[in-house]
Regions:
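Active-site-proximal loop/short-helix segments
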Residues: 54, 58, 115, 122-133
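Hydrophobic faces of well-ordered beta-strands that scaffold small-molecule active sites
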Residues: 30-36, 51-53, 91-95, 120-122
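Catalytic cores of alpha/beta
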Residues: 39-42, 99-111
Length: 144
């Protein structure tokens, strides 16, 4: 586990910049999955450099259900903003399927950015999606 990145002036780097550095580094980057702000703080206290949050953990934490597009974009971005407020660590967050078409994906990126999320990942399933480890999934055509 590496120490927090600093700019040339000694100031802490933006979380987005820090995540890019961590990903580009030759060392293996371990991102513990967190389900709430406390988990993010515990990961920070344990010395991790970044955290990740997935849709299954979010849906199970908030609703006690599997990840099947039951949480809205605003519910997830609000939840992730709490993680980001609780820790200096960069957060790589699940953006589900982007919550619809290309316009929705662009909106998701903007809301996640406002929430303080350093990076996001998007599934290739059609919307609404099915839980990733359950049968009956359909993926978006490559042309789309």
């Amino acid at each position: 586990m590496r120490t927090e990145g600093r700019s040339r002036g000694g100031f802490p780097l933006r979380k987005t910049t820090r995540l890019k550095q961590l990903i580009a580094a030759p060392e293996i980057l371990v991102l513990p999955g967190v389900h709430d702000a406390l988990g993010a703080r515990l990961a920070e206290a344990a010395g991790f450099d970044a955290v990740t949050a997935g849709g299954y953990g979010a849906t199970a934490t908030l609703l006690g259900r599997p990840d099947s597009s039951q949480l809205s974009l605003t519910e997830l971005s609000d939840m992730y903003s709490r993680f980001c407020d609780a820790t200096a660590l960069p957060l790589l967050a699940d953006a589900d399927t982007g919550f619809g078409n290309v316009t929705n994906v662009a909106r998701a990126v903007r809301l996640y950015e406002k929430a303080g999320v350093a990076g996001l990942f998007i599934e290739d399933q059609v919307f609404p999606k099915r839980c990733g480890h359950m049968a009956g999934k359909a993926v978006v055509p490559p042309a789309e």
